Protein backbone atom coordinates (compact mmCIF):
# COMPACT_ATOMS: atom_id res chain seq x y z
CA UNK A 1 0.00 0.00 0.00
CA UNK A 2 1.73 3.18 -1.15
CA UNK A 3 1.25 6.71 0.08
CA UNK A 4 -2.09 8.27 -0.87
CA UNK A 5 -2.42 11.43 -3.00
CA UNK A 6 -2.32 14.23 -0.49
CA UNK A 7 -5.50 16.01 -1.63
CA UNK A 8 -7.64 12.98 -0.71
CA UNK A 9 -6.48 12.94 2.92
CA UNK A 10 -8.44 14.61 5.71
CA UNK A 11 -7.04 14.69 9.25
CA UNK A 12 -9.56 15.72 11.85
CA UNK A 13 -10.21 15.48 15.56
CA UNK A 14 -13.40 15.60 17.56
CA UNK A 15 -13.64 18.30 20.22
CA UNK A 16 -16.30 17.99 22.92
CA UNK A 17 -17.05 18.29 26.62
CA UNK A 18 -17.15 15.08 28.67
CA UNK A 19 -20.33 13.11 27.90
CA UNK A 20 -21.38 15.08 24.87
CA UNK A 21 -20.97 11.96 22.78
CA UNK A 22 -17.70 12.20 20.92
CA UNK A 23 -16.64 8.58 21.43
CA UNK A 24 -20.10 7.41 20.31
CA UNK A 25 -19.84 9.57 17.19
CA UNK A 26 -16.44 8.01 16.52
CA UNK A 27 -18.05 4.56 16.81
CA UNK A 28 -20.68 5.50 14.22
CA UNK A 29 -18.11 6.86 11.77
CA UNK A 30 -16.11 3.64 12.11
CA UNK A 31 -19.26 1.58 11.54
CA UNK A 32 -20.50 3.56 8.56
CA UNK A 33 -17.18 3.41 6.70
CA UNK A 34 -17.04 -0.33 7.37
CA UNK A 35 -13.71 -0.26 9.18
CA UNK A 36 -14.95 -2.92 11.63
CA UNK A 37 -17.57 -5.56 11.03
CA UNK A 38 -20.74 -5.45 13.13
CA UNK A 39 -19.43 -8.39 15.16
CA UNK A 40 -16.24 -6.58 16.16
CA UNK A 41 -17.95 -3.37 17.23
CA UNK A 42 -17.99 -2.64 20.93
CA UNK A 43 -19.28 0.55 22.49
CA UNK A 44 -16.53 3.19 22.55
CA UNK A 45 -14.12 1.33 20.31
CA UNK A 46 -11.38 3.88 20.82
CA UNK A 47 -11.46 3.95 24.62
CA UNK A 48 -9.34 0.89 25.17
CA UNK A 49 -8.79 1.03 28.94
CA UNK A 50 -11.67 -0.24 31.10
CA UNK A 51 -11.34 2.80 33.26
CA UNK A 52 -11.87 4.99 30.17
CA UNK A 53 -15.12 3.25 29.33
CA UNK A 54 -16.36 3.23 32.89
CA UNK A 55 -15.80 6.88 33.59
CA UNK A 56 -16.83 7.81 30.08
CA UNK A 57 -13.61 9.68 29.49
CA UNK A 58 -10.83 9.33 26.96
CA UNK A 59 -7.37 9.35 28.53
CA UNK A 60 -4.89 8.38 25.81
CA UNK A 61 -5.15 9.85 22.33
CA UNK A 62 -6.22 7.20 19.81
CA UNK A 63 -6.44 7.23 16.06
CA UNK A 64 -8.24 5.38 13.31
CA UNK A 65 -8.00 5.49 9.53
CA UNK A 66 -11.26 5.34 7.60
CA UNK A 67 -11.71 4.87 3.85
CA UNK A 68 -14.72 6.74 2.55
CA UNK A 69 -16.16 6.92 -0.95
CA UNK A 70 -17.75 10.35 -1.10
CA UNK A 71 -20.75 11.42 -3.17
CA UNK A 72 -18.40 13.07 -5.68
CA UNK A 73 -17.16 9.56 -6.49
CA UNK A 74 -13.62 9.97 -5.09
CA UNK A 75 -12.04 7.74 -2.46
CA UNK A 76 -10.95 9.68 0.60
CA UNK A 77 -8.78 8.69 3.54
CA UNK A 78 -10.06 10.14 6.81
CA UNK A 79 -7.78 10.05 9.84
CA UNK A 80 -9.73 10.53 13.04
CA UNK A 81 -7.71 11.52 16.10
CA UNK A 82 -9.66 10.90 19.29
CA UNK A 83 -8.34 13.34 21.88
CA UNK A 84 -8.64 13.35 25.67
CA UNK A 85 -11.21 15.93 26.78
CA UNK A 86 -10.09 16.58 30.32
CA UNK A 87 -8.08 19.51 31.66
CA UNK A 88 -5.23 17.40 33.03
CA UNK A 89 -4.36 16.17 29.56
CA UNK A 90 -4.34 19.52 27.74
CA UNK A 91 -0.81 19.01 26.42
CA UNK A 92 -1.79 15.68 24.85
CA UNK A 93 -4.78 17.45 23.33
CA UNK A 94 -2.63 20.22 21.88
CA UNK A 95 -0.31 17.66 20.23
CA UNK A 96 -3.23 15.69 18.79
CA UNK A 97 -4.68 18.93 17.43
CA UNK A 98 -1.33 19.88 15.91
CA UNK A 99 -1.53 16.66 13.89
CA UNK A 100 -4.84 17.67 12.26
CA UNK A 101 -6.11 20.41 9.96
CA UNK A 102 -9.68 20.52 11.18
CA UNK A 103 -12.04 19.63 14.00
CA UNK A 104 -15.60 18.52 14.49
CA UNK A 105 -17.04 20.50 17.37
CA UNK A 106 -19.60 18.23 19.01
CA UNK A 107 -22.11 19.99 21.25
CA UNK A 108 -24.96 18.33 23.12
CA UNK A 109 -28.13 19.93 21.74
CA UNK A 110 -29.82 19.65 25.13
CA UNK A 111 -26.98 21.10 27.23
CA UNK A 112 -25.13 23.59 25.08
CA UNK A 113 -21.55 24.79 25.31
CA UNK A 114 -19.59 23.77 28.44
CA UNK A 115 -16.29 25.02 29.86
CA UNK A 116 -14.12 22.26 28.46
CA UNK A 117 -15.67 22.60 25.03
CA UNK A 118 -14.46 26.19 25.13
CA UNK A 119 -10.95 25.34 26.28
CA UNK A 120 -10.46 22.72 23.58
CA UNK A 121 -12.06 24.81 20.83
CA UNK A 122 -9.75 27.70 21.59
CA UNK A 123 -6.84 25.30 21.33
CA UNK A 124 -8.16 24.11 17.97
CA UNK A 125 -8.54 27.71 16.79
CA UNK A 126 -4.97 28.43 17.95
CA UNK A 127 -3.86 25.47 15.85
CA UNK A 128 -5.54 27.18 12.83
CA UNK A 129 -8.19 24.53 12.46
CA UNK A 130 -11.19 24.69 10.22
CA UNK A 131 -14.11 23.90 12.54
CA UNK A 132 -17.34 22.10 11.62
CA UNK A 133 -20.03 22.35 14.33
CA UNK A 134 -22.09 19.20 14.97
CA UNK A 135 -25.19 19.14 17.18
CA UNK A 136 -25.54 15.77 18.86
CA UNK A 137 -28.46 14.15 20.72
CA UNK A 138 -31.14 15.94 18.68
CA UNK A 139 -33.42 12.94 19.27
CA UNK A 140 -33.76 13.93 22.94
CA UNK A 141 -37.02 15.62 23.92
CA UNK A 142 -35.01 18.36 25.69
CA UNK A 143 -32.94 19.22 22.60
CA UNK A 144 -33.01 22.86 21.51
CA UNK A 145 -30.85 22.98 18.38
CA UNK A 146 -31.65 26.61 17.47
CA UNK A 147 -30.77 27.94 20.91
CA UNK A 148 -27.52 25.97 20.94
CA UNK A 149 -26.60 27.26 17.46
CA UNK A 150 -27.02 30.82 18.72
CA UNK A 151 -24.94 29.96 21.76
CA UNK A 152 -22.10 28.55 19.63
CA UNK A 153 -22.05 31.73 17.54
CA UNK A 154 -22.25 33.95 20.60
CA UNK A 155 -19.66 32.20 22.78
CA UNK A 156 -17.16 30.77 20.34
CA UNK A 157 -17.75 33.18 17.49
CA UNK A 158 -17.90 30.67 14.63
CA UNK A 159 -20.70 30.41 12.09
CA UNK A 160 -23.09 27.66 13.18
CA UNK A 161 -25.82 28.18 10.58
CA UNK A 162 -24.72 25.03 8.72
CA UNK A 163 -24.17 22.94 11.86
CA UNK A 164 -24.90 19.26 11.18
CA UNK A 165 -27.75 17.95 13.37
CA UNK A 166 -27.16 14.29 14.31
CA UNK A 167 -27.90 11.63 16.86
CA UNK A 168 -24.80 9.51 17.35
CA UNK A 169 -26.69 6.98 19.43
CA UNK A 170 -29.32 6.14 16.80
CA UNK A 171 -26.98 6.80 13.86
CA UNK A 172 -29.20 9.56 12.44
CA UNK A 173 -27.59 11.76 9.75
CA UNK A 174 -24.03 10.43 10.27
CA UNK A 175 -23.39 10.41 6.50
CA UNK A 176 -23.80 14.20 6.49
CA UNK A 177 -20.91 14.46 8.95
CA UNK A 178 -18.61 12.51 6.61
CA UNK A 179 -19.64 14.71 3.67
CA UNK A 180 -18.99 17.85 5.74
CA UNK A 181 -15.51 16.56 6.64
CA UNK A 182 -14.67 15.96 2.98
CA UNK A 183 -16.17 19.24 1.76
CA UNK A 184 -15.24 21.71 4.49
CA UNK A 185 -11.94 20.54 5.97
CA UNK A 186 -8.72 21.35 4.07
CA UNK A 187 -6.30 18.63 2.90
CA UNK A 188 -2.88 18.56 4.62
CA UNK A 189 0.16 20.25 3.05
CA UNK A 190 3.52 18.55 2.73
CA UNK A 191 6.39 17.76 0.40
CA UNK A 192 7.23 14.10 -0.21
CA UNK A 193 10.68 14.93 -1.64
CA UNK A 194 11.81 16.83 1.47
CA UNK A 195 13.70 15.16 4.37
CA UNK A 196 11.45 13.21 6.73
CA UNK A 197 9.75 15.32 9.38
CA UNK A 198 7.07 13.75 11.57
CA UNK A 199 5.26 14.70 14.75
CA UNK A 200 5.21 12.19 17.61
CA UNK A 201 1.58 12.37 18.73
CA UNK A 202 1.48 9.69 21.41
CA UNK A 203 3.11 6.43 22.41
CA UNK A 204 2.23 3.40 24.50
CA UNK A 205 3.82 0.15 25.51
CA UNK A 206 2.90 -3.14 23.92
CA UNK A 207 4.15 -6.37 25.50
CA UNK A 208 5.21 -7.89 22.15
CA UNK A 209 6.24 -4.89 20.08
CA UNK A 210 7.85 -2.66 22.69
CA UNK A 211 6.84 0.97 22.38
CA UNK A 212 4.33 1.79 19.65
CA UNK A 213 4.66 5.36 18.43
CA UNK A 214 1.79 7.25 16.86
CA UNK A 215 3.09 9.66 14.19
CA UNK A 216 1.78 12.26 11.77
CA UNK A 217 4.05 12.71 8.75
CA UNK A 218 4.56 16.37 7.82
CA UNK A 219 7.19 16.11 5.06
CA UNK A 220 9.03 13.23 3.45
CA UNK A 221 8.22 9.52 3.56
CA UNK A 222 8.58 7.05 6.43
CA UNK A 223 9.55 3.52 5.35
CA UNK A 224 10.28 0.27 7.11
CA UNK A 225 14.00 -0.25 7.77
CA UNK A 226 14.83 3.47 7.97
CA UNK A 227 17.07 4.78 10.75
CA UNK A 228 15.23 7.57 12.54
CA UNK A 229 16.29 10.20 15.07
CA UNK A 230 14.11 11.72 17.80
CA UNK A 231 15.22 15.35 17.88
CA UNK A 232 14.08 16.25 21.41
CA UNK A 233 15.31 13.07 23.11
CA UNK A 234 18.31 12.86 20.71
CA UNK A 235 18.05 9.10 20.26
CA UNK A 236 18.46 6.94 17.15
CA UNK A 237 16.37 3.86 16.28
CA UNK A 238 15.85 1.47 13.38
CA UNK A 239 12.22 1.19 12.23
CA UNK A 240 10.84 -2.38 12.44
CA UNK A 241 7.34 -1.89 11.11
CA UNK A 242 5.19 0.91 9.78
CA UNK A 243 1.42 0.78 9.71
CA UNK A 244 -1.96 2.37 10.22
CA UNK A 245 -4.83 1.73 12.58
CA UNK A 246 -8.14 0.68 11.15
CA UNK A 247 -8.73 0.34 14.57
CA UNK A 248 -6.79 -2.93 14.22
CA UNK A 249 -3.11 -2.56 13.35
CA UNK A 250 -2.33 -3.04 9.68
CA UNK A 251 1.18 -2.89 8.20
CA UNK A 252 1.89 -0.65 5.20
CA UNK A 253 5.02 -0.19 3.09
CA UNK A 254 5.34 3.55 3.67
CA UNK A 255 3.60 6.60 5.08
CA UNK A 256 3.65 9.79 3.01
CA UNK A 257 3.08 13.46 3.88
CA UNK A 258 -0.19 14.17 5.67
CA UNK A 259 -0.71 10.56 6.71
CA UNK A 260 -1.17 9.36 10.27
CA UNK A 261 0.08 5.96 11.36
CA UNK A 262 2.35 4.13 13.75
CA UNK A 263 5.88 2.81 13.85
CA UNK A 264 7.67 0.37 16.14
CA UNK A 265 11.42 0.44 16.53
CA UNK A 266 12.16 -1.87 19.48
CA UNK A 267 12.16 1.11 21.83
CA UNK A 268 12.27 -0.07 25.42
CA UNK A 269 10.62 2.73 27.37
CA UNK A 270 7.83 5.18 26.72
CA UNK A 271 9.95 7.76 28.56
CA UNK A 272 12.33 7.74 25.56
CA UNK A 273 9.55 8.93 23.28
CA UNK A 274 8.25 12.32 24.28
CA UNK A 275 4.88 13.51 23.07
CA UNK A 276 5.36 16.45 20.68
CA UNK A 277 8.89 15.46 19.63
CA UNK A 278 10.00 15.64 15.98
CA UNK A 279 11.08 12.45 14.21
CA UNK A 280 13.48 12.74 11.26
CA UNK A 281 15.77 10.47 9.23
CA UNK A 282 19.21 10.05 10.74
CA UNK A 283 20.97 10.10 7.34
CA UNK A 284 19.18 13.15 5.96
CA UNK A 285 17.82 15.15 8.91
CA UNK A 286 15.45 18.09 8.59
CA UNK A 287 16.81 21.56 9.44
CA UNK A 288 14.41 22.56 12.16
CA UNK A 289 12.17 20.70 14.58
CA UNK A 290 8.40 21.25 14.71
CA UNK A 291 7.38 24.04 17.10
CA UNK A 292 5.53 23.59 20.39
CA UNK A 293 7.49 20.75 21.99
CA UNK A 294 7.86 20.96 25.75
CA UNK A 295 8.77 18.27 28.29
CA UNK A 296 5.84 17.36 30.52
CA UNK A 297 6.05 18.82 34.03
CA UNK A 298 4.14 17.20 36.89
CA UNK A 299 1.91 19.68 38.72
CA UNK A 300 0.49 17.80 41.70
CA UNK A 301 2.48 15.55 44.01
CA UNK A 302 1.34 13.07 46.58
CA UNK A 303 2.78 10.18 48.56
CA UNK A 304 1.47 6.65 47.90
CA UNK A 305 2.12 4.03 50.57
CA UNK A 306 1.03 0.39 50.77
CA UNK A 307 -1.35 -0.31 53.69
CA UNK A 308 0.59 -3.51 54.29
CA UNK A 309 4.37 -2.88 54.33
CA UNK A 310 5.00 -6.31 52.79
CA UNK A 311 3.33 -5.10 49.57
CA UNK A 312 6.08 -2.53 48.93
CA UNK A 313 7.90 -4.56 46.25
CA UNK A 314 4.63 -5.22 44.44
CA UNK A 315 3.88 -1.51 44.48
CA UNK A 316 7.32 -0.76 43.03
CA UNK A 317 6.77 -3.27 40.22
CA UNK A 318 3.28 -1.91 39.50
CA UNK A 319 4.59 1.67 39.30
CA UNK A 320 7.29 0.57 36.88
CA UNK A 321 4.66 -1.00 34.64
CA UNK A 322 2.42 2.08 34.68
CA UNK A 323 5.41 4.28 33.92
CA UNK A 324 6.02 2.22 30.77
CA UNK A 325 2.69 3.41 29.46
CA UNK A 326 2.42 6.87 30.93
CA UNK A 327 5.51 9.02 30.66
CA UNK A 328 3.85 12.00 32.35
CA UNK A 329 3.69 10.08 35.63
CA UNK A 330 6.89 10.24 37.72
CA UNK A 331 7.82 8.69 41.05
CA UNK A 332 10.68 8.35 43.53
CA UNK A 333 11.05 6.42 46.77
CA UNK A 334 10.34 8.07 50.10
CA UNK A 335 10.07 6.94 53.69
CA UNK A 336 7.83 8.27 56.39
CA UNK A 337 8.10 7.58 60.11
CA UNK A 338 4.36 7.08 60.27
CA UNK A 339 3.63 5.17 57.07
CA UNK A 340 6.85 3.31 56.33
CA UNK A 341 8.22 2.92 52.79
CA UNK A 342 6.37 4.33 49.80
CA UNK A 343 6.69 6.60 46.78
CA UNK A 344 6.40 10.31 46.11
CA UNK A 345 4.55 10.58 42.81
CA UNK A 346 4.08 13.45 40.38
CA UNK A 347 0.91 13.89 38.31
CA UNK A 348 -0.49 16.26 35.70
CA UNK A 349 -3.50 17.07 37.85
CA UNK A 350 -6.15 15.64 40.11
CA UNK A 351 -7.92 13.46 37.58
CA UNK A 352 -4.58 11.98 36.57
CA UNK A 353 -3.82 11.25 40.24
CA UNK A 354 -7.18 9.53 40.73
CA UNK A 355 -6.77 7.47 37.59
CA UNK A 356 -3.27 6.27 38.48
CA UNK A 357 -4.37 5.41 42.00
CA UNK A 358 -7.42 3.58 40.72
CA UNK A 359 -5.36 1.67 38.14
CA UNK A 360 -2.85 0.63 40.81
CA UNK A 361 -5.64 -0.62 43.05
CA UNK A 362 -7.59 -2.28 40.28
CA UNK A 363 -5.07 -3.72 37.84
CA UNK A 364 -2.51 -4.74 40.45
CA UNK A 365 -4.97 -5.11 43.35
CA UNK A 366 -2.98 -3.15 45.92
CA UNK A 367 -4.35 -1.36 48.98
CA UNK A 368 -2.94 2.15 49.08
CA UNK A 369 -2.90 5.14 51.39
CA UNK A 370 -2.35 8.48 49.67
CA UNK A 371 -1.10 11.50 51.59
CA UNK A 372 -2.63 14.94 51.04
CA UNK A 373 -1.85 16.16 47.51
CA UNK A 374 0.56 19.10 47.34
CA UNK A 375 1.78 21.31 44.54
CA UNK A 376 5.33 22.29 43.58
CA UNK A 377 6.51 25.35 45.50
CA UNK A 378 9.52 27.46 44.62
CA UNK A 379 11.70 28.52 47.52
CA UNK A 380 13.91 31.56 46.99
CA UNK A 381 16.66 31.01 49.54
CA UNK A 382 18.46 33.77 51.45
CA UNK A 383 21.74 32.88 49.69
CA UNK A 384 20.18 33.70 46.31
CA UNK A 385 19.54 30.14 45.07
CA UNK A 386 16.16 28.69 44.08
CA UNK A 387 14.85 25.27 45.18
CA UNK A 388 11.73 23.34 44.27
CA UNK A 389 9.77 21.81 47.12
CA UNK A 390 7.68 18.72 46.34
CA UNK A 391 7.06 17.49 49.85
CA UNK A 392 6.16 19.77 52.77
CA UNK A 393 8.06 17.46 55.16
CA UNK A 394 11.34 18.43 53.40
CA UNK A 395 10.92 22.15 54.06
CA UNK A 396 14.26 23.70 55.12
CA UNK A 397 14.72 26.05 58.08
CA UNK A 398 12.48 29.13 57.75
CA UNK A 399 15.37 31.48 58.54
CA UNK A 400 17.15 30.35 55.36
CA UNK A 401 14.16 31.06 53.11
CA UNK A 402 13.67 34.51 51.64
CA UNK A 403 10.29 34.06 49.86
CA UNK A 404 8.03 31.17 48.82
CA UNK A 405 6.24 31.18 45.45
CA UNK A 406 3.24 29.02 44.62
CA UNK A 407 1.63 28.13 41.27
CA UNK A 408 -1.54 30.00 40.23
CA UNK A 409 -4.12 28.93 37.70
CA UNK A 410 -6.50 30.77 35.41
CA UNK A 411 -9.88 29.08 35.85
CA UNK A 412 -12.93 29.46 33.61
CA UNK A 413 -16.22 28.48 35.21
CA UNK A 414 -19.55 28.30 33.39
CA UNK A 415 -22.54 28.21 35.71
CA UNK A 416 -26.29 28.81 35.54
CA UNK A 417 -27.18 32.27 36.81
CA UNK A 418 -29.00 30.98 39.94
CA UNK A 419 -25.81 29.55 41.43
CA UNK A 420 -23.51 32.45 40.56
CA UNK A 421 -23.45 33.88 44.10
CA UNK A 422 -22.33 30.58 45.64
CA UNK A 423 -19.66 30.06 42.99
CA UNK A 424 -18.23 33.56 43.48
CA UNK A 425 -18.16 33.06 47.24
CA UNK A 426 -16.35 29.73 46.81
CA UNK A 427 -13.67 31.36 44.63
CA UNK A 428 -13.36 34.30 47.04
CA UNK A 429 -12.90 31.91 50.00
CA UNK A 430 -10.13 30.17 48.09
CA UNK A 431 -8.11 33.41 47.81
CA UNK A 432 -9.22 33.91 44.21
CA UNK A 433 -8.99 37.13 42.22
CA UNK A 434 -11.83 37.80 39.77
CA UNK A 435 -10.61 38.61 36.27
CA UNK A 436 -13.80 38.63 34.24
CA UNK A 437 -17.53 37.94 34.42
CA UNK A 438 -19.89 37.96 31.47
CA UNK A 439 -23.08 36.30 30.35
CA UNK A 440 -23.53 33.67 27.69
CA UNK A 441 -27.25 33.32 27.14
CA UNK A 442 -28.62 32.33 30.54
CA UNK A 443 -25.29 31.27 31.94
CA UNK A 444 -22.52 33.22 33.58
CA UNK A 445 -18.92 32.77 32.51
CA UNK A 446 -16.56 33.61 35.36
CA UNK A 447 -12.81 33.85 34.97
CA UNK A 448 -10.76 33.68 38.16
CA UNK A 449 -7.12 33.50 39.13
CA UNK A 450 -6.76 30.96 41.95
CA UNK A 451 -3.81 29.41 43.81
CA UNK A 452 -3.49 25.78 42.72
CA UNK A 453 -2.92 24.82 46.35
CA UNK A 454 -6.54 25.75 47.13
CA UNK A 455 -7.90 23.86 44.13
CA UNK A 456 -6.13 20.52 44.65
CA UNK A 457 -8.14 19.65 47.71
CA UNK A 458 -11.88 19.65 47.20
CA UNK A 459 -12.56 22.61 44.94
CA UNK A 460 -14.11 20.60 42.12
CA UNK A 461 -16.43 18.64 44.43
CA UNK A 462 -17.50 21.83 46.21
CA UNK A 463 -18.18 23.55 42.91
CA UNK A 464 -20.36 20.66 41.76
CA UNK A 465 -22.33 20.57 45.01
CA UNK A 466 -22.88 24.34 45.11
CA UNK A 467 -24.15 24.35 41.53
CA UNK A 468 -26.10 21.06 41.86
CA UNK A 469 -23.76 19.60 39.24
CA UNK A 470 -24.47 22.22 36.57
CA UNK A 471 -21.26 24.25 36.68
CA UNK A 472 -18.36 23.18 34.50
CA UNK A 473 -14.77 24.08 35.21
CA UNK A 474 -11.57 24.29 33.21
CA UNK A 475 -8.13 25.61 34.09
CA UNK A 476 -4.56 26.06 32.94
CA UNK A 477 -1.48 26.93 34.98
CA UNK A 478 -0.63 30.59 34.50
CA UNK A 479 2.40 31.47 36.64
CA UNK A 480 4.16 31.42 40.01
CA UNK A 481 3.43 34.18 42.53
CA UNK A 482 4.81 35.02 45.93
CA UNK A 483 2.59 33.98 48.81
CA UNK A 484 2.60 34.18 52.60
CA UNK A 485 2.88 30.42 53.10
CA UNK A 486 3.80 28.62 56.30
CA UNK A 487 4.50 25.00 57.14
CA UNK A 488 1.99 23.62 59.61
CA UNK A 489 3.08 20.57 61.60
CA UNK A 490 0.81 18.30 63.61
CA UNK A 491 2.23 17.10 66.94
CA UNK A 492 0.84 14.12 68.81
CA UNK A 493 2.18 13.90 72.37
CA UNK A 494 4.78 16.52 71.39
CA UNK A 495 6.10 14.33 68.54
CA UNK A 496 5.69 15.73 64.98
CA UNK A 497 3.85 13.41 62.55
CA UNK A 498 5.56 13.87 59.19
CA UNK A 499 2.77 12.48 57.01
CA UNK A 500 0.35 15.15 58.21
CA UNK A 501 2.48 18.27 57.75
CA UNK A 502 1.40 20.67 55.01
CA UNK A 503 2.05 24.11 53.57
CA UNK A 504 -0.88 26.47 54.05
CA UNK A 505 -1.54 30.16 53.66
CA UNK A 506 -1.08 32.03 56.93
CA UNK A 507 -4.70 33.21 56.95
CA UNK A 508 -6.01 29.64 56.61
CA UNK A 509 -3.56 27.97 59.00
CA UNK A 510 -5.60 28.32 62.17
CA UNK A 511 -8.87 26.95 60.78
CA UNK A 512 -7.09 24.07 59.00
CA UNK A 513 -5.07 23.28 62.14
CA UNK A 514 -8.11 23.32 64.40
CA UNK A 515 -10.10 21.06 62.07
CA UNK A 516 -7.21 18.60 61.91
CA UNK A 517 -6.77 18.49 65.71
CA UNK A 518 -10.49 17.93 66.30
CA UNK A 519 -10.50 15.15 63.75
CA UNK A 520 -7.48 13.41 65.28
CA UNK A 521 -8.93 13.74 68.78
CA UNK A 522 -11.84 11.55 67.68
CA UNK A 523 -9.66 9.11 65.77
CA UNK A 524 -6.77 8.31 68.11
CA UNK A 525 -7.84 5.79 70.77
CA UNK A 526 -7.50 6.82 74.43
CA UNK A 527 -4.36 5.70 76.27
CA UNK A 528 -3.62 5.42 79.99
CA UNK A 529 -2.19 8.92 79.94
CA UNK A 530 -3.36 12.25 78.59
CA UNK A 531 -2.33 13.02 74.98
CA UNK A 532 -2.14 16.56 73.61
CA UNK A 533 -2.79 16.91 69.84
CA UNK A 534 -1.40 20.20 68.57
CA UNK A 535 -1.01 22.13 65.33
CA UNK A 536 2.10 24.29 65.19
CA UNK A 537 3.78 26.78 62.89
CA UNK A 538 7.47 26.61 63.76
CA UNK A 539 7.53 26.79 67.56
CA UNK A 540 4.15 28.48 67.90
CA UNK A 541 1.16 26.30 68.79
CA UNK A 542 -1.95 27.52 66.94
CA UNK A 543 -4.50 24.87 67.95
CA UNK A 544 -4.76 22.17 70.58
CA UNK A 545 -7.08 19.36 71.59
CA UNK A 546 -6.52 16.94 74.47
CA UNK A 547 -7.35 13.25 74.46
CA UNK A 548 -8.43 12.37 78.03
CA UNK A 549 -6.65 9.57 79.85
CA UNK A 550 -8.30 6.29 80.71
CA UNK A 551 -8.24 6.17 84.52
CA UNK A 552 -8.46 3.21 86.85
CA UNK A 553 -10.42 3.80 90.04
CA UNK A 554 -7.59 3.27 92.57
CA UNK A 555 -9.70 4.30 95.58
CA UNK A 556 -12.29 1.58 95.03
CA UNK A 557 -10.97 -0.68 97.77
CA UNK A 558 -10.96 2.12 100.43
CA UNK A 559 -14.20 2.38 102.37
CA UNK A 560 -14.57 4.99 105.09
CA UNK A 561 -11.34 5.84 106.88
CA UNK A 562 -9.12 8.85 106.52
CA UNK A 563 -8.98 11.09 103.41
CA UNK A 564 -5.17 11.03 103.48
CA UNK A 565 -5.25 7.32 102.58
CA UNK A 566 -7.17 8.14 99.37
CA UNK A 567 -4.90 11.12 98.72
CA UNK A 568 -1.83 8.89 98.89
CA UNK A 569 -3.24 6.44 96.33
CA UNK A 570 -4.33 9.22 93.97
CA UNK A 571 -0.93 10.92 94.20
CA UNK A 572 0.80 7.65 93.49
CA UNK A 573 -1.37 7.19 90.39
CA UNK A 574 -0.57 10.74 89.27
CA UNK A 575 3.19 10.04 89.54
CA UNK A 576 2.82 6.93 87.41
CA UNK A 577 0.83 8.80 84.73
CA UNK A 578 3.47 11.53 84.63
CA UNK A 579 6.22 8.99 84.04
CA UNK A 580 4.10 7.20 81.46
CA UNK A 581 3.54 10.41 79.54
CA UNK A 582 7.28 10.94 79.44
CA UNK A 583 8.16 7.50 78.08
CA UNK A 584 4.87 6.22 76.69
CA UNK A 585 4.52 5.89 72.90
CA UNK A 586 1.28 6.84 71.22
CA UNK A 587 0.12 4.35 68.62
CA UNK A 588 -1.73 6.09 65.82
CA UNK A 589 -3.84 3.52 63.99
CA UNK A 590 -3.77 3.33 60.19
CA UNK A 591 -7.49 4.21 59.99
CA UNK A 592 -6.79 7.49 61.79
CA UNK A 593 -4.29 8.44 59.08
CA UNK A 594 -6.57 7.54 56.24
CA UNK A 595 -9.47 9.49 57.76
CA UNK A 596 -7.31 12.51 58.64
CA UNK A 597 -5.91 12.67 55.11
CA UNK A 598 -9.43 12.27 53.68
CA UNK A 599 -10.54 15.34 55.58
CA UNK A 600 -8.17 17.42 53.52
CA UNK A 601 -9.20 16.08 50.22
Swiss-Prot record:
Molecular function as annotated in GO: GTP binding; GTPase activity; guanosine tetraphosphate binding; ribosome binding; translation elongation factor activity
GO BP, sorted A to Z? positive regulation of translation
Q: Which Gene3D superfamilies match?
A: 3.30.70.240, Elongation factor 4, C-terminal domain, Elongation Factor G (Translational Gtpase), domain 3, P-loop containing nucleotide triphosphate hydrolases, Translation factors
Residue ranges of coiled coil? none
Protein topology in the membrane: Peripheral membrane protein
Q: Which cellular components does GO assign to this protein?
A: plasma membrane
Residues binding GTP: 19-24, 136-139
Compartments where located: Cell inner membrane
Q: Which residues form the tr-type G domain?
A: 7-189
Annotated disulfide bonds: none
Q: What is its main location?
A: membrane
Q: Kindly report, in one word, the top-level EC class recorded for this enzyme.
A: hydrolase
Recorded catalytic activity of this chain's protein:
GTP + H2O = GDP + phosphate + H(+)
Q: Does the keyword Translocase apply?
A: no
As recorded in UniProt, its EC number(s) are 3.6.5.n1
UniProt entry keywords in alphabetical sequence = Cell inner membrane, Cell membrane, GTP-binding, Hydrolase, Membrane, Nucleotide-binding, Protein biosynthesis
* One Pfam family of this chain: EFG_C
Instruction: Quote the function comment for this protein.
Output: Required for accurate and efficient protein synthesis under certain stress conditions. May act as a fidelity factor of the translation reaction, by catalyzing a one-codon backward translocation of tRNAs on improperly translocated ribosomes. Back-translocation proceeds from a post-translocation (POST) complex to a pre-translocation (PRE) complex, thus giving elongation factor G a second chance to translocate the tRNAs correctly. Binds to ribosomes in a GTP-dependent manner.
Task: Note the HAMAP family from the entry.
Answer: LepA
Give the family from UniProt.
Belongs to the TRAFAC class translation factor GTPase superfamily. Classic translation factor GTPase family. LepA subfamily.
The protein's name: Elongation factor 4
Species of the source:
Methylobacterium sp. (strain 4-46)
What would be the name of the gene that encodes this protein? lepA
Amino acid sequence: MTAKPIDTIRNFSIVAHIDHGKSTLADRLIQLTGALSAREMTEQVLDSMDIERERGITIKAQTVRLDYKAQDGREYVLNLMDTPGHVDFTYEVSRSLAACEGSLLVVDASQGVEAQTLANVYQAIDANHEIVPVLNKIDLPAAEPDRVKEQIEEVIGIDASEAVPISAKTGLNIEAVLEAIVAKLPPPKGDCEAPLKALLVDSWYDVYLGVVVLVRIVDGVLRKGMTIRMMGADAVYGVDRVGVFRPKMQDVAELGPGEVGFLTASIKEVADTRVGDTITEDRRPTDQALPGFKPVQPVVFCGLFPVDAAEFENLRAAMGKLRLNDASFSYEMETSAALGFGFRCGFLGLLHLEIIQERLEREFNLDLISTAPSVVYRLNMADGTMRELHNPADMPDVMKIDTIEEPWIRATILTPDDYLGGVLKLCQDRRGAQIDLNYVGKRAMVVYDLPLNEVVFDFYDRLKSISKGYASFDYHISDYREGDLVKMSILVNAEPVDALSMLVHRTRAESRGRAMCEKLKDLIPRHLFQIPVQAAIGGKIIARETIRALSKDVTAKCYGGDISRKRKLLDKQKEGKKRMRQFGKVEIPQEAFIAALKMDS
